[in-house]
Regions:
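Cyclophilin-like peptidyl-prolyl cis-trans isomerases
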Residues: 1-133
Length: 133
């Protein structure tokens, strides 16, 4: 399992959209289509090739929190083009700071993240409150 703490303070719209997609089951069964060693794993694309999305875009919500190892951010082609694709950093990535929406961090299961390979599937994502952990 991978447990991600979401940041609704610095990325409220992204967090809301991510939670809404989870509630709809959007991510269940999707794959991690891109794995770049020592950089990121990327998933959340319904097409599975890096070109798909949810049919809407989100505004870029740049935060002052750094992209350290385990940071969760939104994929974009340019500002304000985020959708459903997200990435998890495998190492510290300071060049991403203030450039991408960082909306969460892995708090448990980073060993699992580091073993992911392209094509591995998201079996299911569920929302757990901190009280339920």
């Amino acid at each position: 399992n991978i447990i991600i703490r979401l940041d609704g303070y610095y990325a409220p719209f992204t967090t809301d959209a991510f939670l809404s997609a989870i509630e709809r089951g959007f991510y269940n069964g999707l794959n991690f289509h891109r794995v770049v060693p020592n950089f990121v794993v990327q998933g959340g694309d319904p097409r599975g090739d890096g070109w798909g999305g949810p049919g809407y875009t989100l505004l870029t919500e740049r935060s002052p929190i750094e992209f350290n190892c385990g940071a969760v951010g939104m994929v974009r082609t340019e500002y304000d083009t985020e959708g459903s694709q997200f990435f998890i950093t495998l190492t510290d990535q300071p060049q991403l700071n203030y450039q991408y929406t960082r909306f969460g961090e892995v708090i448990c299961g980073m060993d699992v993240v580091k073993r992911l390979e392209a094509g591995d599937r998201i079996l299911a994502i569920s929302v757990v409150t901190m009280d339920e952990r």
